[in-house]
């Protein structure tokens, strides 16, 4: 594996020239074409004034042009600020101002979104910070125009992911070319990619989850299938027609794809579907997967460590397969290690004890862009990343993720995974979905349940409470049930995330008025 994207893609263009690199529903590009087109794009970018050290805001959906821009930027020595296509003027302004973007690439007509109108809402003084803007049509013109190649830049911080910023300003998580390539190689090895591998990338490339899906295949010479706009039906069709072997997606999307399958043969080439638990627990996912003959495994990752950082093993020789369907996993890089720490005493914990998960991995970020102090605080003195996640270790290579530490509940002197209570609440009559948080009441922490009702259901809090007390330890039974039309959310690159901090504020306000 080379240390720069240019060298790696150049090698693949020589060894796999005719193999499809990126496959879209109505077009495709092979490895030689992708390499040549990215070279031309880099030369045109440089001709337009793009310089090493500049930052490029990449505001495109999944597709060939997204990949071309990344490779071109890497060749010049530019840092790509990946921008979610769902972003609006406030977020775009933040990318330009705090992210220091000097160039912007966007697709004005994508998905019926008025990108030019969104930009018009960004203050003129902020847009003036840009050296230039390019549309998708500009890119398509550039890659077809012959031009002299430019020299390839050395390894540098080439790509940032934006954290979701549910409780603070988003951070720009920076990764180097060599770090991305090293992790991609580990992913390809861990999932046993071979000459027949074809990976479906449904999550946005702008997020760590989608990018790791892309890079693990593409940078190792395997085909990647993607589309700019996806739904369960279109993804099912791509899986069937493109002989997809692997895909990694959120659990809700995988369930939708499996539900609409016409026959098991739709998935005859599939070797593994990896799922991340972005949605509340979906037990029917495993039944649908079994009915369709699709192997499933739980995943784990983050922007700081890269996604597909861990996957539960399917082979008993590699770890405990009894937790196959739980998030977390066996660490993908062979030299990565995991441990758990008590968040209150700071003592390291033994296997099976819940605490904050800490991970040591070569896939770690280079830092937070322009925030060295924040990056320093993210790691222990011996290099482990403080994930902020609650979980327990099976070994120093495998663990189970339970919840975000901020979401974990300290009840009755114990750390409690809210999903344990939520599962019980969601089985109550009339409850469609539940979120449980803790608040302070009568000198102790107590759980509060927020619920969304099933259609035509009527709230029954007294019955719900007695049922919970029958099925759970008393300290886990919610002291209050609050009915909402919908949970407060924030959009991230991979999913819509429920704002637990907002629910905690609401819960405390309720408890403050409770006798």
Predicted regions and their residues:
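AMP-binding/adenylate-forming catalytic core of the ANL superfamily
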Residues: 87-94, 104-108, 247, 361, ...
């Amino acid at each position: 594996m080379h240390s720069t994207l240019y060298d790696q893609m150049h090698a693949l263009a020589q060894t796999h020239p005719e193999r499809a690199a990126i496959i879209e529903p109505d077009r495709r590009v092979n490895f030689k074409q992708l390499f040549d087109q990215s070279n031309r794009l880099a030369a045109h970018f440089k001709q337009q004034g793009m310089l090493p050290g500049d930052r490029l805001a990449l505001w495109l959906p999944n597709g060939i042009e997204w990949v071309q821009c990344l490779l071109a930027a890497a060749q010049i020595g530019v840092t790509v600020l990946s921008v979610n296509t769902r972003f609006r003027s406030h977020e775009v302004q933040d990318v330009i101002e705090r992210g220091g973007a000097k160039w912007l690439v966007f697709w004005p007509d994508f998905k019926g979104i008025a990108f030019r109108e969104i930009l018009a809402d960004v203050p003129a003084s902020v847009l003036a910070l840009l050296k230039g803007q390019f549309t998708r049509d500009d890119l398509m013109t550039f890659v077809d125009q012959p031009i002299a190649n430019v020299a390839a830049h050395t390894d540098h911080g080439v790509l940032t992911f934006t954290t979701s910023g549910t409780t603070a300003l988003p951070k720009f998580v920076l990764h180097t070319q060599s770090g991305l390539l090293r992790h991609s190689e580990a992913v390809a090895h861990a999932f046993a990619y071979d000459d027949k591998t074809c990976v479906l990338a449904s999550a946005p490339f702008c997020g760590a989850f989608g990018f790791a899906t892309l890079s693990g295949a593409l940078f190792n010479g395997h085909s990647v299938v993607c589309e700019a706009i996806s739904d369960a039906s279109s993804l099912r069709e791509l899986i069937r027609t493109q002989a997809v072997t692997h895909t990694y997606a959120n659990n809700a999307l995988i369930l939708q794809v499996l539900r609409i399958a016409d026959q098991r043969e739709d998935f005859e080439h599939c070797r593994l579907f990896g799922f991340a638990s972005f949605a509340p627990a979906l037990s029917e996912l495993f039944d649908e997967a079994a009915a369709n003959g699709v192997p499933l495994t739980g995943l784990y990752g983050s922007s700081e460590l890269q996604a597909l950082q861990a996957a539960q093993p399917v082979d008993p020789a590699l770890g405990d397969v009894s937790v196959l369907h739980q998030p977390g996993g066996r660490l993908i890089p062979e030299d990565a290690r995991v441990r758990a720490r008590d968040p209150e005493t700071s003592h390291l914990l033994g296997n099976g004890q819940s605490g904050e998960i800490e991970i040591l991995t070569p896939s770690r970020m280079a830092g937070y862009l322009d925030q060295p102090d924040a990056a320093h605080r993210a790691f222990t003195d011996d290099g482990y990343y403080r994930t902020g996640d609650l979980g327990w270790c099976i070994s120093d290579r495998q663990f189970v993720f339970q919840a975000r530490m901020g979401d974990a509940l300290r009840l009755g002197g114990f750390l409690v995974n809210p999903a344990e209570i939520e599962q019980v609440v969601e089985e109550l009559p009339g409850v469609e979905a539940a979120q449980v948080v803790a608040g302070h009441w009568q000198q102790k922490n107590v759980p509060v349940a927020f619920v969304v009702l099933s259609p035509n259901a009527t709230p029954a809090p007294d019955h719900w409470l007695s049922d919970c007390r029958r099925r759970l330890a008393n300290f886990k039974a919610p002291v209050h049930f609050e009915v909402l039309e919908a949970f407060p959310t924030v959009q991230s690159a991979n999913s819509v995330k429920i704002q637990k901090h907002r629910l905690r504020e609401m819960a405390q306000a309720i408890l403050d008025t409770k006798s």
